[in-house]
Amino acid sequence: MRKLIVLSVALLLAGFTQLEATTDSTLRMSNVIYEGDVRAVRLYQQNSGFSFPILTLGGGESLVLEFDQIKSERDFYQYTLVHCDAQWNPTSLSRTQFLDGMGYENIETANFSNGTLTQYTHYSVSVPGEQTKPKIGGNFILLVYRNFDEKDIVLSRRLMVLNSQGAVNMQIKQSGQVELRSTHQQINFSFTKNANYFMPNAMQDVKTVVLRNGEWDYSIDDLKPMFIVGNEMQYNQTLGNQMDGLNQYRFFDIRSFRSSTAGVRQRLNIANQKHVILVNDKTRRFERYFNWADFNGRVLYDNKDLPMPAGTAFESDYCFVHFSVSADA
């Protein structure tokens, strides 16, 4: 017997909004939203919306932080950076020791939604600003707060500042364990330090983290090298560096509310709110594997109904997306 399981979730018409809000206002050194009306948070490199949030120390690059708040009034936000150790605990350094400038920036750019059923305010800012330039490399938490009160936290995001002291080479391959070959991937990598970089104890001084699809929720931490040959540390463990490969992500396109798009069965306006009904899906358990070229769960923010893409961030509407899957009872 098979039954249809129906689920609904609120999404941005131009893409996906991360459901990671918490009612606890205590700062967590991770990617967290602390207010329920904040949506669609993104932190990415200036010229690539899918990039990992990493900067090169003194390199002149910028990250872009964007987010929405589901209300038509503007709040006044600031951000700062918190320096962390390898385990993402705040260090004892004072802000003047790791940042140039006053140590905070105002988030000046705010656009009210235009032509949308859901009223929201879109905020954006370049990171770092003139008053928040990192002086050292390492792990940082970007902390957004309201009205100059760092206890009134809105969101936090992890980012890294790279002070390159070597090079990393990596290879992803099928698991070397026979029983895991159909489910896991093995990540072999090596780190070659610069010849003039002094490292007293490589086994203790080098901290590693391997992320699956750039997500901190699933990582392999603090692997130790199998071999150290000259300036090169080799991490080719048999078991420690393996990750389960997951399934292919399911795809749907909600970039338009006017024309047909992939995976969408119906579009509705109900009680002044947009709804999208996706095509009924089914389990792929017994189907032949098909390699779909996706973005590993990442989302493209776009709106095909706009004549110009410049307004995508504040002229795209939110909608409820209803999806269903047939599964064994």
Question: Model features per residue range: what roles?
Answer:
Residues 1-25:
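Bacterial Sec-dependent N-terminal signal peptides
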Residues 22, 259, 263-297, 303:
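Preference for solvent-exposed, low-hydrophobicity sequence contexts
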Residues 24-27, 161-182:
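Low-complexity, Pro/Ser/Thr- and charge-rich linker/hinge segments at domain boundaries
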Residues 33-83, 180-193, 306-324:
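Contiguous beta-strand segments within globular domains
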Residues 72-101, 199-223, 329:
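Extended low-complexity, serine/threonine- and proline-enriched intrinsically disordered segments
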Residues 106-109, 114-128, 229-252:
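Aromatic sugar-binding surface patches on proteins
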Residues 117-147:
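Ligand-binding face of N-terminal immunoglobulin V-set domains in extracellular IgSF glycoproteins
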Residues 286-328:
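Basic K/R-rich, polyanion-interacting modules in nucleoproteins and related proteins
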